[in-house]
Every structure is written in structure tokens, then in C-alpha cells.
């Protein structure tokens, strides 16, 4: 039986998000804007990235503390060479119940079959518009929508479970809410709408660009009636709705207007081995050094336990309460820890 570890607010450690690279082939403005992450930007050298063996070892230690769900992130995780091999290694870890991956989808058609065969269960594809011109502007590199839709089709054919994430920004892509809902309802994939968040320090976040989830629900409900659905499990971040008369669902991730800090069970491991206890964290705890310095599994396990047991973060709740000085706090970039 895995040990149970709780933070200062009695939140268990259940989910581990593992970033495998800080690189991405997109330059989305809310994550990795091109004016900051330009040609001269210095990404992590290979020597500083956790190896697959180190990631697998840490995964084993995390599962001994109660983690059952693993999500592979980036950057863009498919830019890490031989990623299916890592999936295979994690799949063999006792206690791992579910392996998912978040991707921009542009490289998915090349790798979906190998990922499925290696043991990947699910994939979440980030897609913010079906309009080619707008999508090219949003991804900052002129990628076309078809490259992502092709990846989704190949992944579905391979047998991967698929969800789509759409970050909604008022005045940027809010006109795409209904077209996205119609399209993915027809395709049979769950579409999740995410409120534009103040992650990192470089995405130019403004509160007036947030489209509240309740507004999105109202907009869709007027055309395609929705019925609220119960959560699947403790700590589920998305509020779920199904289309009336069907089992097809949408989800709403309302991290700005309806903070879910009180049930957050996620830890985040960056590509170079720092452990972050919140998406909005200012700093992380280094696990790479103890791994490479010869610490035993038990020593690293107790280090992780201590980090989680002193966890007291609730950034989104503090944002809602307008905590003084919150907007001046430095935060890790989302591209570094995978959202």
C-alpha cells in the first residue's frame, strides 16, 4: 500500500505532471511569446534535463507516496526524442494507474501509434481556434489547423482517449467558442474551455480578457442545451456538462472565477528536476541534485514528503480575494512546467 501524504490543507498528493522539455515549436502568446522566447533564447542543455531513468526512478518514489496519475507535459513533449520509450518505462512502474500527455498536436500524427503501443492512455490537445488565420496568429508560427486535426484523427484511430483544451481570451478568440463546440460535439471528443490565466510573467494577462465559464455555458446552452454533470473524482478541475439527450460532454476550467485550490492534488516536476507545488509557484525544490548525488530512494522519498507536507499554497483563491502584492509576485513560466 502506498503511503498517504497530506499538505497543510489536508490535500493528498495524487497527481504528478512531468515536463520532459522546456522547448516548443509554437510561440503562443499566453505561454511562450516570440518576443521573449526568440532565436537567442537559451533553453536547457541536454545535460541538465532529467534522463528517462531519473524520471522513472522519481515516478517510482512518487507512487510510493500515493501518486497514481502521471501527465507528460513540456514545453511540447513530442520534441523530446524517443518519448515512447519513456512512456514504456513509466508504464512498468507499480502503482501507475493512468498516463496522459498534453500536446499542441502538431507532431501527434507521427507518434500517436507508438505512444499508444508504449502504454499511453490519454492525450489532451491544446487548440484555440479552427480558423486558420487566427490559429496561425495564436501559435505565433503560422501552423495550420489541419496539422493538429490530423494528429487528433490519428490518435483516435490508434485508440487513445482524447480531450481538447481551448484557452478563451475575450477579443482574441471568443468568437470561436460556438464553432469549436459544434465541431467537437460532432467529432465525439470532449472539449474543455479554460479561462485565460495569469500564469508566468510574460503573457500580458488582463482580467478584462477573461471570459467567465458561466458566460461560455450560457452561450452554448442557448444553441445546444446543456445538463450539469457530477464530478468523476475528488480534485477534478473541470466542471462537466453534457449535451441534452446525449452522453457527449464539455468541460469548464474556471481557475480565475471559481478557484479549485482547496482540492488540488497536483505536483509538477520540471524538465531539469525541480518540484513545484503550484502552477503559479515562484520557485521549486531541486530533486535532480539529490538523485545525481547518490541519495537513496528513501532519502528522496522523505525529501518529497517534507516538501508536500509544508505546502500551503492557494494562489487562485488569493487572487479572488485580491490579496495585496499578489500581482507583483514572480511566477514560473507555464512553458517550464507544462500548465
Curated annotation (Swiss-Prot):
PANTHER family: MOLYBDENUM COFACTOR BIOSYNTHESIS PROTEIN 1, MOLYBDOPTERIN COFACTOR SYNTHESIS PROTEIN A. GTP binds at residues 17, 71, 102, 163, 266-268. Residues 319-339 are annotated as: Disordered. Its EC number is 4.1.99.22. S-adenosyl-L-methionine binds at residues 30, 75, 126, 197. PROSITE patterns: MOAA_NIFB_PQQE, RADICAL_SAM. NCBIfam families: moaA. The gene is moaA. Its cofactor is [4Fe-4S] cluster. This is GTP 3',8-cyclase.
Amino acid at each position: 500500500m502506498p503511503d498517504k501524504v497530506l499538505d497543510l490543507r489536508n490535500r493528498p498528493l495524487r497527481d504528478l505532471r512531468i515536463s520532459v522539455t522546456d522547448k516548443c515549436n509554437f510561440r503562443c502568446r499566453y505561454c511562450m511569446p516570440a518576443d521573449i522566447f526568440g532565436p537567442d533564447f537559451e533553453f536547457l542543455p541536454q545535460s541538465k534535463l532529467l534522463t528517462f531513468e531519473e524520471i522513472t526512478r522519481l515516478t517510482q518514489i512518487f507512487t510510493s507516496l500515493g501518486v497514481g496519475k502521471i501527465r507528460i507535459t513540456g514545453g511540447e513533449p513530442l520534441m523530446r526524442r524517443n518519448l515512447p520509450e519513456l512512456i514504456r518505462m513509466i508504464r512498468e512502474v507499480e502503482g501507475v494507474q493512468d498516463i496522459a500527455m498534453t500536446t499542441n498536436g502538431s507532431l501527434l500524427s507521427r507518434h500517436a501509434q507508438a505512444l499508444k503501443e508504449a502504454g499511453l492512455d490519454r492525450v489532451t490537445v491544446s487548440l484555440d481556434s479552427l480558423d486558420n488565420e487566427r490559429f496561425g496568429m495564436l501559435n505565433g508560427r503560422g501552423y495550420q489547423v489541419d496539422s493538429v486535426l490530423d494528429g487528433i484523427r490519428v490518435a483516435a484511430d490508434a485508440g487513445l482517449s482524447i480531450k481538447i483544451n481551448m484557452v478563451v481570451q475575450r477579443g482574441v478568440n471568443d468568437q470561436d467558442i460556438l464553432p469549436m463546440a459544434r465541431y467537437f460535439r460532432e467529432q465525439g471528443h470532449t472539449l474543455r474551455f479554460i479561462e485565460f490565466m495569469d500564469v508566468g510573467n510574460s503573457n500580458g494577462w488582463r482580467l478584462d480578457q477573461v471570459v467567465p465559464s458561466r458566460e461560455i455555458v450560457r452561450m452554448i446552452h442557448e444553441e445546444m442545451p446543456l445538463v450539469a454533470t457530477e464530478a468523476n473524482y475528488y480534485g477534478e478541475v473541470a466542471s462537466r456538462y453534457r449535451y441534452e439527450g446525449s452522453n457527449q460532454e464539455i468541460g469548464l476550467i474556471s481557475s480565475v472565477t471559481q478557484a479549485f485550490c482547496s482540492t488540488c492534488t497536483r505536483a509538477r516536476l520540471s524538465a531539469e528536476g525541480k518540484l513545484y507545488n503550484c502552477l503559479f509557484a515562484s520557485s521549486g525544490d531541486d530533486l535532480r541534485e539529490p538523485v545525481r548525488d547518490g541519495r537513496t530512494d528513501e532519502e528522496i522519498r522523505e525529501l518529497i514528503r517534507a516538501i508536500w507536507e509544508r505546502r500551503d499554497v492557494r494562489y487562485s483563491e488569493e487572487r479572488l480575494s485580491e490579496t495585496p502584492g499578489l500581482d507583483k509576485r514572480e511566477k514560473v513560466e507555464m512553458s517550464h512546467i507544462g500548465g
